[in-house]
Amino acid sequence: MVGAAAAEAATVRYYSVAPDVRLNVRSGPGTSYGIIRVLPEGAKVPIYCQTPGTSVSGPYGTSNIWDNISNGEYVSDAYVNTGSDGYVADRCS
């Protein structure tokens, strides 16, 4: 198992997206990847694993961490309230 599939075997926590933000979900860990969909305001996301990518500035600071929220779907950690500036989940493999 790899990526989100492997992480699904573990306990997954859900985290809130920053208030008043419609967050782009991308096909990879960076702003150069295509937008797959947009999360609505008030969304909560699971974090299956995290990986480094494009550095992004958002409500929770500047971060190069990207959160894998589903198979092939990533959001910038700078927009997710994890309570930490670092990794809160295993790194994606």
Residue positions per predicted region:
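SH3/SH3-like beta-barrel superfamily modules
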Residues: 37-85
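SH3-family beta-barrel domains
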Residues: 6-27, 38-41, 86-93
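A generic alpha-helix preference that emphasizes hydrophobic side chains
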Residues: 4-6, 66
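Short alpha-helix capping/helix-loop boundary micro-motifs
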Residues: 29-34
